[in-house]
Amino acid sequence: MKIGIYTLGCKVNQYETQAMEQELTARGHELVDFESSADAYIINTCSVTAVSDKKSRQMIRRAKKNSPDAVVAACGCYVQTHEEEAKSLGIDLLMGTNDRARFLDRLEEAVKTRETVADIDDALRRRTFEVLPAGGMANRTRAMLKVEDGCVNFCTYCIIPYARGPVRSLPMDKAAEQVRALRSQGYRELVVTGIEISSYGHDLKDGTTLIDLLELIALEGGEMRIRLGSLEPRTVTREFCERAKKLPTLCPHFHLSMQSGCDATLRRMNRRYDTARYYESVELLREYFDDPAITTDLITGFPEETEEEFGETLAFIEKCGFAAMHIFPYSVRPGTKAAAMAQVDMSVREERAARAAAVAERMHQGYLARCVGKSFPVLFEQDRREGSVGHAPNYMPVTVGMKGLHNTVQNVRITAVDGDGLRGEPEET
C-alpha cells in the first residue's frame, strides 16, 4: 500500500521515522509524499511546546483532508501525553512513543479491518531500550544512531519525561553492530542521538558512560565522523575532554544545554547546575579543542523571570560566546510544575527572545568570521545552483563553486562569510 509520513520534532523522532520507513519498505509498501493520495498516513508527533501540539493536530487534520478514505495513524510525544485530545481528532490508530514494530503491525491491520485502535502504555513504567534498525535516508551522507531514550531530570517546564519514560540505553554490543552496519552502507557521518544522551549507561549498571560509547563508535566506525547530540554540563569533565580529544573522528561541535544564564531561574527550572558549573564546561571544551562550536538552547520569559534576571542571562551568553543558539519563548506545558508558577506575559517572553536573538546573531557572525582563512575537511551533502554544499566538522555550512561532490570529504579553505554560512575553495590534494 501507499503510505505518507510526516515527522515533527527532534532528531529522535526523525530517527524513529527512518526506522519505520525502512521496515515499511522491507514489508513491500510504497512511501509517498505526505501531500499525495495514500492508503495510510503516519504522523510522528511532538509535544515539546504548545506550538508543537498545534502543528501535530494540524498535520493530523491535513492527512484526513488529503485522502478522506485513508487510515490515519499517529504516534509520538503528543499522542503519548494528550491521549484523550488526540482521540477527539478522529485518528484511526493511536500509539505513543514505544514499540514501533507493533505500531506498523497495527497499521496494516487497521487498513484491512478499518477498526479504530488506541494502544498507549504508561511511559514511566518502561525499562527496556527498543532497538530499532540504524540508518539514514536514501542518498544522505549522515546517519543517526539512537543510543538512549527517556529522561529522569524532571525539569519543571518539561513534559518529555512523561512522554518518554525513564532512561534506557542501547547496549554496547548492539551499538557496535549498528555502527558497523552504517559504515558498510557508506555513511560518512554518524549523529549520536537520544532524549538525554548524557545519561547513557545509567541503566546498564556496569559503569558504562557516554565517553565509553564514543570510544567504541570511533573504533568501529573507521573514518566515519561522529557528531554529538545535546549534552548536559555535567558530562563535560576533564576526564571526558581528555578522552574525547583522542578521538580523531569526533566533531568539535558541542551543543551544551543551558536554558538560562541566571542561577535563580535555573533553580526554578530544576536544572541541577549553576552558571559557574556551566561555564566550567565551556572553558574545558575550549581548552581541549581548537575553537570548537559551542551551541545552546535558551528559554526566555520563564515563570517569575524578572528583567534583572534576564539581564544576567544576556550577560552570561555574551561571556560564553556561543557559535549558535536556539531561542524559545517559554511555552506552558500543562501538568508541569512551571505551569503553576506566576507566568510572564507572552509579549515580554517574545520581546526577550528577540533581544537574545540579536546577541546570538552577533556572536554567530563573529564565529563565522573567525573561520575565514582556515581550512576544514568538509563533508558535502548536496548540489545547489551555486555549487556543492556541506558542513565543516564544527557544523558550519560551507559552499564551494564546484558541483558533483556529494558524499565526499574535501579540504576547503574558507574565503568568506556567506550569510549564515561560509564560502570557500577546495584545496588541491
Regions found by a protein language model. Name each.
Residues 1-200, 239, 250, 254, ...:
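Proteins enriched for Cys/Gly/acidic motifs involved in redox and nucleic-acid/cofactor modification
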Residues 340-429:
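Terminal RNA-binding accessory module
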Residues 101, 153, 165, 198, ...:
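Glycine-centered loop/turn positions within well-structured domains
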Residues 175, 192, 228, 256, ...:
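Conserved, mostly hydrophobic/aromatic
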Residues 7, 230, 258-260, 380, ...:
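Flexible glycine-/small-residue-rich
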Residues 47-48, 164-165, 204-207, 267-273, ...:
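Short glycine-enriched, charge-decorated loop/helix-capping segments at active-site entrances
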Residues 138-141, 151-152, 250, 260, ...:
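Short flexible coil/turn linkers enriched for glycine and charged/polar residues
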Residues 72-73, 81, 184-307, 318:
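Conserved SAM/AdoMet-binding glycine-rich loop
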